[in-house]
């Protein structure tokens, strides 16, 4: 009798879940409600077609659920045609660890202030959009961020110095915007990790902070700005820097006086006002890429290492640089 009742109960629950899928949903109902409101705010775009009220939101495209809590922990809308501003509703997904809007040319307006509510956020990527306005100071409140990418937008104004207060940041991308002003001095005083730093293709001016001498950047790209003066503070014999791009600025310093880390594999300093000679220590470095063209360098290119593996375009248009792969010195 007990076996029959147990079988009957199991069948009843099975048929109930078939007739009412909501009973078998893993998705948290509060999260589902917020997601459906986000879909509506974006005008029901095709990329969110799988977001239907009668299905489990843990199975929806562009979202993932935590395997233990079943709360939405990732919202990633990539290369789909969503239009308008980022809805404030994104701040009502309290368990988000990843938020991404990427390659959304019709996404406009400022960076949504409600994002500051997402204290558990680890990765924020708002890139290749038409977002405008400033880089907001409130981003420094997201202490769990390990990755911040605001590249390829229309952001303007100064870079907030408070971003150096993000203790877990592994990479900071602000490249390909319209940012102005100086690089914050505080970027030479990151309180935790030293992040890979990408500030290229902006309108930044002034000197590179001397505090950078204290930072050991693995990768740093400051190219295509209006930076002036001495960039030697980026380098150092005891650092572990691998990739440096300072090209197309107004930098002016003596290359032969710089101590370079043995870890350096890529150096691009083309189109500056850098003078001196190419250090003989370059023959000891395992360069995968090198470009020192369009500067004011003189003297013979040292022979050895990888230096002769690069063509003349890596060296030409200097004041009096000579030797292979350029013409012989006279």
Swiss-Prot record:
Superkingdom in the source lineage: Eukaryota
Ranges: LRR repeats: 69-92, 93-118, 119-141, 142-166, 167-192, 194-215, 217-237, 239-261, 262-285, 287-309
Keywords: Apoplast, Cell wall, Disulfide bond, Glycoprotein, Leucine-rich repeat, Repeat, Secreted, Signal
GO cellular component term, pick one: apoplast
Keyword Ribosomal protein: no
Cellular compartment(s): Secreted, Extracellular space, Apoplast; Secreted, Cell wall
Disulphide bonds in the chain: 27-57, 58-65, 298-320, 322-329
Residues of this chain annotated as glycosylated in UniProt: 106, 130, 144, 154, 238, 254, 291
Segments passing through the bilayer: none
Organ and tissue specificity: Mostly expressed in fruits, and, to a lower extent, in flowers and leaves.
Modifications made to the protein after synthesis: N-linked glycosylated.
Signal peptide as annotated in the record: 1-24
Pfam families reported in the protein's UniProt record: LRR_1, LRR_8, LRRNT_2
Gene3D superfamilies named in the record: Ribonuclease Inhibitor (3.80.10.10)
Entries under InterPro entries matching the protein: DNA_repair-toleration, Leu-rich_rpt, LRR_dom_sf, LRR_N_plant-typ
Functional description taken from the UniProt entry: Inhibitor of fungal polygalacturonase. It is an important factor for plant resistance to phytopathogenic fungi.
Family of this protein: Belongs to the polygalacturonase-inhibiting protein family.
Subunit structure comment from the entry: Homodimer.
Name of the protein in question: Polygalacturonase inhibitor
Species, as recorded: Pyrus communis
Lineage: Eukaryota, Viridiplantae, Streptophyta, Embryophyta, Tracheophyta
Gene encoding the protein: PGIP
